[in-house]
């Protein structure tokens, strides 16, 4: 590998380093007719909307200039009134939220009781059966223990 000569490849560049104006248009010439029509259609609409935005801004500034002295003069009345209105709105909203929570809780309890009352007779029957089975088991066990005691007593008498 050391005995091979190194080769340098040089690729010629087009344009020789000067700027050619960005992306080239494949067809040549200016913008297409569709683009020109789109600009001509959008120009009046954009201008109208810009004029309306300017008028709205001017009206807002004039309204603020006119009402600022009124806000300053009536601020001892307006600030407490705004606080009262804010508290009233907050109380109505919290009242509604608490009422909705109460209704949903009541609905859940009623649904739970309805489901429980439907399954209660079945559970009572199961409890009765378990008690009867347990009573029968205890009776059987008592008989067995009694017989065991009798048999041991008889064995004790014999010996």
From Swiss-Prot:
The chain crosses the membrane at residues 45-65, 70-90, 92-112. The keyword Cell wall biogenesis/degradation does not apply. InterPro entries: Oleosin. Residues 1-24 are annotated as: Disordered. Its main location: other. It is found in: Lipid droplet; Membrane. May have a structural role to stabilize the lipid body during desiccation of the seed by preventing coalescence of the oil. Probably interacts with both lipid and phospholipid moieties of lipid bodies. May also provide recognition signals for specific lipase anchorage in lipolysis during seedling growth. PANTHER family: OLEOSIN, OLEOSIN 18.2 KDA. This is Oleosin Cor a 12.
């Amino acid at each position: 590998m050391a005995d091979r000569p190194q080769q340098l490849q040089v690729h010629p560049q087009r344009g020789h380093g000067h700027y050619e104006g960005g992306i080239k248009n494949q067809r040549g010439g200016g913008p297409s007719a569709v683009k020109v029509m789109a600009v001509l259609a959008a120009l009046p609409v954009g201008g109208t909307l810009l004029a309306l935005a300017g008028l709205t801004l001017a009206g807002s500034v004039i309204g603020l200039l006119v009402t600022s002295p009124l806000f300053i003069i009536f601020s001892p009345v307006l600030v407490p009134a705004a606080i009262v209105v804010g508290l009233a709105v907050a109380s109505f909203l919290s009242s509604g939220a608490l009422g909705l929570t109460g209704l949903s809780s009541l609905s859940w309890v009623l649904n739970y009781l309805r489901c429980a009352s439907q399954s209660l007779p079945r559970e009572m029957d199961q409890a009765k059966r378990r008690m009867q089975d347990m009573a029968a088991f205890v009776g059987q066990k008592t008989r067995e223990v009694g017989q065991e005691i009798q048999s041991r007593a008889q064995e004790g008498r014999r010996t």
